[in-house]
């Protein structure tokens, strides 16, 4: 299947040159890393990031911090496992798919072999295109990856995993099997957990709640993430993808996590009464 983008022209520009200008702005923005990716690194081990998925004008500079780190730690052929929440309610509880996703920068191929192996080994995972057709949380990550590819930093294939079910046990299962299949197939991989943090709360409230979950992520405490989200009613849309990413990364040997940047939509709109929180976090 060839999937067409559904939020190009809304969350990010649909035209090639306008999108390139926007991506470069995200890197060079005062809220971004303030420099463009310029060199490929040496891949020594898997890398995980937490990355936001709002409109680029709001969260793109935050996301750029994570992709800058990716560029410094990869080379050659890399499979990007991208986990995102299901906002649409379409399709199955946990799903991947095979095929190609179109972007304004060109086509991105799914690692069909990895997706098929993961589907066959992980009982909670379905092959289901419907979950992905109108979901934006994975799509908005692809232009950043394709941009790195166009800079000859790496050659990417990806595996989309859309999570409507985000309970703790299911999320841990997904993470376990990602790591298992990655080891079995000896792939160079990065794992991207797509999530925004608190939604439509005051800057003070959102920052305070988000700090609780960010602390858990930095300490690689997967169960505490789930507990804090539930206990403190934190409206983080992709806690399941984050838990799955951390489980997979720990199984692949990760020991450290660093907060690269935190910001809110209020830092753009200057309206701090109702904001959405965004964080870029590195796990390795």
Curated annotation (Swiss-Prot):
What Gene3D superfamilies does its record include? Answer: LigB-like
What InterPro entries does this protein map onto? MEMO1_fam
- Annotated transmembrane regions: none
The record's Pfam families line, in alphabetical order, gives: Memo
- Domain of life, per lineage: Archaea
The record's PANTHER family line, in alphabetical order, gives:
PROTEIN MEMO1
Q: Which family does it belong to?
A: Belongs to the MEMO1 family.
* Protein name per the record: MEMO1 family protein MmarC5_0191
Q: Which organism is it from?
A: Methanococcus maripaludis (strain C5 / ATCC BAA-1333)
């Amino acid at each position: 299947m060839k999937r067409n983008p559904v939020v190009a022209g809304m969350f990010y520009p649909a035209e090639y040159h306008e999108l390139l200008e926007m991506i470069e702005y995200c890197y060079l923005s005062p809220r971004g890393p303030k420099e463009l990716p310029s060199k490929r690194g040496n891949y020594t081990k898997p890398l995980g990031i937490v990355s936001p998925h709002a409109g680029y004008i709001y969260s793109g500079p935050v996301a750029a911090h994570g992709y800058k780190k990716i560029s410094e730690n990869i080379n050659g052929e890399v499979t990007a496992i991208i986990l995102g929440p299901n906002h649409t309610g379409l399709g199955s509880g946990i799903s991947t798919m095979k095929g190609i996703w179109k972007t304004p920068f060109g086509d991105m191929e799914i690692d069909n072999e990895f997706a098929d192996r993961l589907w066959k080994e992980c009982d909670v995972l379905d092959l289901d295109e419907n979950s992905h057709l109108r979901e934006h949380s994975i799509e908005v990550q692809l232009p950043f990856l394709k941009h790195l590819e166009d800079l000859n930093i790496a050659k990417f294939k990806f595996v989309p995993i859309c999570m409507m079910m985000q309970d703790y046990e299911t999320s841990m299962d997904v993470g376990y099997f990602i790591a298992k299949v990655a080891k079995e197939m000896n792939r160079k991989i990065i794992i991207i957990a797509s999530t925004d943090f608190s939604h439509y709360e005051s800057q003070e409230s959102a920052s305070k709640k988000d700090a609780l979950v960010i602390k858990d992520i930095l300490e690689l405490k997967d169960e505490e993430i789930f507990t804090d989200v539930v206990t403190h009613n934190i409206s983080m849309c992709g806690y399941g993808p984050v838990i799955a990413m951390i489980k997979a990364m720990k199984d692949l040997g990760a020991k450290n996590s660093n907060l690269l940047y935190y910001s809110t939509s209020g830092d753009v709109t200057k309206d701090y009464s109702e904001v959405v929180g965004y964080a870029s976090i590195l796990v390795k």
